[in-house]
Amino acid sequence: MSKNYLNQRNKVEDFLFKSKFDYENQPINRLKKVEIIENKQELLKKLKLKIENLEDCELKNNANKIVFSDGNKDSSVMIIGEGPGQKEDELGKPFVGDAGILLNKMLAAINLDRKDIYITNVVNYRPPSNRKPETKEIKRYSEYLYEHVEIINPKMIILLGS
């Protein structure tokens, strides 16, 4: 017999009762996200610094300010826009131009206040001439966006833009 064959029951027993589930004489930490919750502000600062320190970034070279985020970092709702426009680039906050006025009206229509929502963009610098972010730009910023979502850990994500 060159191979041991395990039936389904043996697989379950191996999975449930082998050494990886042996417990030591100490409590089990089931709250793995506590560290993230406690340090959310610090993690957001580090993420923003990472984005600000990007090198060889055409978007960064053409923009005035980083447009990182706005709103409640503890919100269960996160809005992700496509990219900042001219007004956002001037003020360094997402959705403060015409799109922001429309967003505020839409939120009010469903009894939500902007200050209770967390808002960011796919790319954090304004594309030249208010054009849509290109695929390569979106890919470059996607790792930062994933990290951003992980830090905020919303229950709902609303995507805006084209």
Where are these predicted regions, by residue range?
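Non-catalytic accessory regions outside enzyme or core folds
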Residues: 1-21
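A polyanion-binding, active-site-adjacent surface
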Residues: 15-162
